[in-house]
Amino acid sequence: MTSTTDKAGQPKSETPEWEIKAAKQSRLAFGLAVAELARRDEKVAAISADTIDLFGLRPFLEASPERLIEAGIAEQNAMGIAAGMATTGMRPIICGYAPFITTRSLEQLRNDVAYANQRVVIGAACGGIVLAMAGGTHHAVEDLAIMRNMPNMTVIVPADARQTWHAAMATEQLDGPCYIRLGGKFDEPDVTELDADFRIGRADQLRNGDDITVIACGALVAPAVATSQALAHDGIGVRVLNMHTIKPLDRDAVLAAAVETGAIVTAEEHRVTGGLGGAVAELLATEQPTPMRMIGMPDEFAIVGPPAQVREHYAMGEGAITDACRDLMR
């Protein structure tokens, strides 16, 4: 008899590996995971905030139209619907835009989902400044700070499409709400392996190093790895932690890095206040004071322009990470 579980005892995926690897964009990998979760559990339903095509949900809509609700450009309604469904034992998964699902529906998110500790998963596409050309209304550079301050909320920022798949599938283990920040309509470099172990709340050490540590999440993980590779040629060992879970933070990994390498650089496509940098700084300030630099957006609204130009303007990339590492090494 053919086994229906994998080595870890989890149900085997019906989604072909090639399809996950071909996704290349975290929003599409999340959509594939939604369909897979729905195949495993009839209580899973998707709620779209005018994002069916953004998340690649059309095949799911055609296969299970009764389990996909189109709320339209009405994030407050989407969040309220999800909270209501969760109270009946359903497992709603919201698919929305990061800048809107975290601000427009904040009251419902806080009171109906987080306060009530409802089992609602929020997939938030276009996090950071991937929609920078659309102006300040479409920048999502405070979403992690908002979500970190919601009791009961798990906050995940996958490094690539492959890790997004694992993050979404891992929400089966959660009994409360979860926010997963995703990218936009750009291919994302692969920095993780599809067969890599993924655990909520446990950082991935992508590069070894004893001189300094870069702790990064999301879009800045790849530049962090590139920095480590470049500085290795100069004899500088840069440890790279992919801190995919912002909350709960992997305290052990952060504190070990502080003790073993003596200096920390954080890197995120988010304001330096309240996100990954803030979480790491709060921990180090109370447990292990350590020299530190934070790469991210300053306390201002971002300029408008192509994402690459905005990243360069605010020094959110490999060059800035490298400079911060060298500065701390002096």
What are these regions, as identified by a protein language model?
Residues 1-181, 186, 197, 318, ...:
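Thiamine diphosphate
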